[in-house]
Amino acid sequence: MDKQNTDSEKRATAEAPPQSLCTLVSSSEQGGMDITNHNAKAGAADEYPHGVRLAAVVFSLMLGMFLVALDNTILGTAIPKITDEFHDLNKVSWYGSAYLMTFGCGFQSTWGKFYKYFPIKVWFLVAVFIFEVGSLICAVAQNPTTLIVGRAIAGFGGSGVGVGIFTIIGFAAPPENRPQLLGFTGATYGIAAVLGPLIGGAFTDKCFYINLPIGGVAAGTIFLLFKPPTSASPAKATPKEKFLQMDLVGATLMMGLIVSYILALQYGGQTHSWKSSEVIGLLVGFFLFVLAFVTWEIYQKERAMIVPRLFMRRYISVGSIYMFFFSGAYFIILYYLPIYFQSVYNSSPIGSGVKMLALIIPLTLAAIVQGWALSKIRIVPLFWIIGGALGTVGCGLFYTFDTETSVGKWVGYQIIVGFSTGWTFQIAMSNAQVHAPPEDMSQATAIVNFFMTVGGAFFISAAQCAFSNQLIKTITKNLPELDPTVAISTGATQIREAFTASQVPIVVDAYMVGLKAVFAITIAAFGVATVIGFFGSWKKLLADELEKATGGVA
């Protein structure tokens, strides 16, 4: 079996529950693993690390997953403070979109090809190094542009780290133990999701320094203790074929269309009129990039980052489109709830992180329950519809937020949205793993993940556009003597210091109007996702199909 198929197998076990690390080490030390013919080429048992070496490798992979997960959640509560330092609220969408754009928009497929055709260990260390460089740039950034560039570099490196973790797992333990390793990484992701808002709130603009020692330990451990088995040797191909497999043209076109889209929404109604040549030109460029990207991917066929043959299959297309809208709504909430708490409630960054635990803890618990529930219910659209409907209701309740919303309400509403997100987020990936044949599994899961991250980048930008336009419109109407750009350039946590006592309530109300526009977008996104969920296959999954997606532990 080539490396791509091995990668497919280890991805297919992602829903397995975590088990004790001691149990894993012990079972690995016993040797004599029963490896099936299907997985025989994943490496002989004596090539796998054992004992302390295995524990160290697993620990380093958990650190790597912690890094990737933390960077998805740490920034939300830090953003309002960062806007204070840079005096620019208008760049908020870029702080999130820049990372998501390079983290998932085609580059996961590219990194997968790197791990297939080049030494795994070397390129994993390269990915960690790139991520660390991006984090360092973010940490020392003195202006928004530098921070955005750092976020983009970190996203590209983080994409390689994420793909590399799952690839190394495929060669760090025999097939029957891989679900346990994936369970550890899954648990680590949940821990990072909980700690991210707290760390971001506590360290605010210095939060990026945290990545440096963690990444250093992870890279050092892999460098010293992980020895790739002979089965992990790079796949044979000509230099030309290796280059073509990267689909760098597709990745470039995708970057072009996302940048055009983000800039159009950033300029429109804020620094330029919607009818200006700049905005119209960017929107036209966006649609031309979309057309070019689709045409190129069809032409590339099996070399494409989005293989047309796979995307036309219902279990991938419906799940991918569903997650485009669903994850878009989730990322908006992750980035704009802290702004609500810090601007309207005057919470500190760490205070807003504590308040968001009402969202993150139910999300994590629901994600754990979801794996068990899927093995019992086995009807995928039910999860999509329930999750989307709860998200729609929860965000509808978010829309009722005002400057005097009680604690009970904002806690309860977050619990609803958190549960809906955790209940649903992994279903599309599991469904792809269930139905895709082994040779297509890595590509199938990559397509679903691609749409998840692109959805985040698109909807964060749309939310920022709506927020800024409504903020400007409201201040212009209710406080005409104040230049709206002053409110935009004032950080969310500096409202009460930057404006007079008579102006503060009006500016806070303007923030609330902008946030209501943001929440309206999440209502629409969750609602569209709910409708799309009805188009999934209602055929009940078979037990052996679920075993395929959970490594035989469903």
From Swiss-Prot:
CDD domains the record matches: MFS_Azr1_MDR_like
Main location per the UniProt record: membrane
TM annotation in the entry: 54-74, 93-115, 120-140, 152-172, 181-201, 206-226, 248-268, 279-299, 321-341, 349-369, 379-399, 410-430, 447-467, 518-538
Location within or outside the cell: Membrane
Membrane topology label: Multi-pass membrane protein
InterPro entries, sorted: MFS, MFS_dom, MFS_trans_sf
Protein's UniProt keywords contain Endoplasmic reticulum: no
Entry similarity comment: Belongs to the major facilitator superfamily.
UniProt function note: Probable efflux pump; part of the gene cluster that mediates the biosynthesis of griseofulvin.
Name used for this protein in its record: Probable efflux pump gsfJ
Organism from which the protein derives: Penicillium aethiopicum
Taxonomic classification: Eukaryota, Fungi, Dikarya, Ascomycota, Pezizomycotina
Gene: gsfJ
